[in-house]
Amino acid sequence: MQAIIDANLFGEIKNCDLAAVISSNPEAYAIERAQYAGIPVYVVDRSIFPNRLSFTKALLDKLQDLEMELVVYAGFNYILGSQLIKAYENRIINIHPSLIPSFCGPGYYGLRVHEAVLAHGVKVTGATAHFATEIADNGPIILQKAVEILEDDTPRTLQRRVMEQAEWKILPEAISLFCERRLIIDGRRVRIKEEFNDES
């Protein structure tokens, strides 16, 4: 999330107002980061809800109360119910630490992704920014960035490099493209419109 805050601060995310951070974990460090940046914080504590449906409903209610136009999953590893996905169709951006469709879907999150990447001996990994759907890591792909795997990589060193070289770059860029209304969704494909230059 810090990459989004920094990119917004330095004007790299255009036409966007970081209106709120909603955390499902009252102990999340993201809360402190958001407060330090002056971003309003709301907690919808997942642990107090009996099931996914009730948690999803509470989260949807909060998003609608705040009149959010875009939702970004930043470190959010929980598959939400269909009611929120449908209400925000093509308006939820997720970042995944692999080149989808490889090493993605149920069970592939956090360090597990990088462990699987190394176990399979692939030479290149990376990150994918995509629209979230009801199926994990299956939505239209907005941006991808490759990261070379080094001989001495461990899951942790690879995780760090994928974050620094890919995730922290393409997630703010995907948000900016959305806010500039430059994304055209055509089925499973996302096309990016050319940037309009006022000075030309």
Predicted feature residues:
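One-carbon transfer enzymes
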Residues: 1-200
